[in-house]
């Protein structure tokens, strides 16, 4: 089991951004993080009732809070998958259509500036519940 911590989330983001920068040096997004936001996100994730809710909430909160200077949505997907794997599941994004729909949902969340819309969270819960498989 891999414990998802603030430090691990930062490490995931940095590693992911380094690979991105290698492939797209002209699109450098910067590397930085807000440890307080990340700690708050993890605290709130733990309050969720089940692993699907935790994964969906993690996806939403990272996309909404933008705790990293770049790669927030990509980092959110990796972190949500870790939470699922710790419970014996994995996120299975089968095709480009699935990927694009998740991206659309995360952009919806990102645009919600006052608070996360419960309807969008419900869509994320449904998305995750239909795209997990036992490992």
Question: What does each model-identified segment do?
Answer:
Residues 1-135:
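FIC/Doc superfamily catalytic core
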């Amino acid at each position: 089991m891999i414990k998802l911590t603030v430090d691990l989330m930062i490490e995931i983001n940095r590693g992911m951004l380094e690979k991105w920068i290698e492939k797209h040096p002209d699109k450098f997004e910067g590397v930085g993080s807000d440890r307080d936001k990340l700690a708050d996100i993890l605290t709130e994730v733990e309050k969720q009732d089940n692993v699907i809710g935790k994964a969906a909430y993690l996806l939403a909160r990272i996309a909404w809070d933008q705790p990293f200077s770049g790669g927030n949505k990509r980092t959110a997907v990796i972190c949500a998958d870790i939470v699922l794997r710790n419970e014996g599941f994995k996120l299975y994004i089968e095709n480009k259509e699935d990927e694009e729909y998740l991206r659309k949902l995360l952009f919806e969340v990102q645009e919600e500036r006052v608070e996360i819309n419960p309807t969008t969270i419900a869509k994320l819960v449904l998305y995750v519940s239909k795209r997990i498989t036992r490992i």
